[in-house]
């Protein structure tokens, strides 16, 4: 959980640069501090350098896919798992269904509703976005 007054940090992992940047821009606009990574290898390097309140990862990526990233986080940064979610366009791929059922983390299927993304990020981070807090006078 983020200390009061500090912006929640989010890591967006997606090999589709346009999608990663769109999500980052939308979350930044809501008051989150957002970094992006194009694959699981870069994401692991970012996690070694900085603490993140939420990690959003695509499933299908080159180098290290979402499944591999999840397993590496499980081994190296298990505290992050309760703040992890998938964003994916692979709802039709049965290869991942058993894995997703096993790990029991939130999954948003592309295209997704941005309000649902905001709700899940807020829920996982345990922090109210700075933009919303400023409006409510918190």
Annotate the PLM regions.
Residues 31-38, 46:
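Short hydrophobic/Thr-rich beta-strand motif most characteristic of the beta2 strand and flanking loop
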Residues 21-29:
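Charged docking surfaces used in two-component/phosphorelay signaling
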Residues 48-50, 73-82, 102:
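Conserved phosphotransfer cores of two-component systems
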């Amino acid at each position: 959980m983020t200390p009061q007054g500090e912006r929640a940090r989010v890591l967006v992992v997606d090999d589709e640069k346009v999608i990663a940047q769109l999500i980052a821009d939308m979350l930044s606009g809501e008051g989150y501090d957002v970094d992006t990574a194009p694959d699981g290898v870069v994401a692991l390097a970012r996690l070694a350098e900085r603490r993140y309140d939420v990690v959003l990862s695509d499933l299908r990526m080159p180098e290290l896919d979402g499944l591999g990233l999840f397993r590496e986080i499980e081994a190296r940064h298990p505290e992050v798992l309760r703040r992890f979610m998938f964003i994916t366009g692979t709802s039709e791929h049965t290869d991942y269904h058993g894995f997703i059922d096993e790990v029991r983390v939130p999954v948003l299927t592309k295209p997704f509703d941005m309000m649902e993304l905001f709700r899940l990020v807020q829920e996982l981070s345990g922090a109210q976005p700075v933009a919303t807090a400023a409006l409510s006078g918190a």
